[in-house]
């Protein structure tokens, strides 16, 4: 298994697919990385030579990936919450922040349904 950016890349997969195991690298960015390094996209990870792996590491270092990207994302959300803006308030309450309806739906953000309170008669 090749270890790139602190992540073990699966051996049996093509290089493009294997690179997507790194947080912050999707299919399009993986293809651009392979083009920049001159590595064929259909080459398996186990067939990569040490210079190929070094070239991939050097190219990936140019991007914000893994822990740094996660940290930046959480800091951006924390900044919104500290500002007290609409999006920050919605993050704090655990509700959708992009204008979706919440009377029905929004179960992913709100979590499972709570039991309703019955009125005493």
Swiss-Prot record:
Residues 91-121 are annotated as: Disordered. Pfam families: Ribosomal_S13. GO terms for molecular function: rRNA binding; structural constituent of ribosome; tRNA binding. Keywords: Ribonucleoprotein, Ribosomal protein, RNA-binding, rRNA-binding, tRNA-binding. Coiled coil: none annotated. One of its GO terms (cellular component) is cytosol. InterPro entries: Rbsml_uS13_C (IPR027437), Ribosomal_uS13 (IPR001892), Ribosomal_uS13-like_H2TH (IPR010979), Ribosomal_uS13_bac-type (IPR019980), Ribosomal_uS13_CS (IPR018269). PROSITE patterns: RIBOSOMAL_S13_1, RIBOSOMAL_S13_2. GO terms for biological process: translation. Part of the 30S ribosomal subunit. Forms a loose heterodimer with protein S19. Forms two bridges to the 50S subunit in the 70S ribosome. Located at the top of the head of the 30S subunit, it contacts several helices of the 16S rRNA. In the 70S ribosome it contacts the 23S rRNA (bridge B1a) and protein L5 of the 50S subunit (bridge B1b), connecting the 2 subunits; these bridges are implicated in subunit movement. Contacts the tRNAs in the A and P-sites. Belongs to the universal ribosomal protein uS13 family. NCBIfam families: uS13_bact (TIGR03631). This is Small ribosomal subunit protein uS13. It comes from Ralstonia pickettii (strain 12J). The lineage of its organism: Bacteria, Pseudomonadati, Pseudomonadota, Betaproteobacteria, Burkholderiales. The gene is rpsM.
């Amino acid at each position: 298994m090749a270890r790139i950016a602190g992540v073990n890349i699966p051996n049996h997969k093509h290089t493009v697919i294997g690179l997507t195991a790194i947080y912050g690298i999707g299919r399009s960015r993986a293809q651009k990385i392979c083009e920049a390094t001159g590595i064929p996209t259909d080459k398996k990870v186990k067939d990569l030579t040490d210079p190929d792996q070094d070239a991939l590491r050097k190219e990936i270092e140019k991007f914000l990936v893994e822990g740094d990207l996660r940290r930046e994302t959480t800091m951006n959300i924390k900044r919104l919450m500290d500002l007290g803006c609409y999006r920050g308030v919605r993050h704090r309450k655990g509700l959708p922040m992009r204008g979706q309806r919440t009377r029905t739906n929004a179960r992913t953000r709100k979590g499972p349904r709570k039991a309703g309170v019955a009125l005493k008669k």
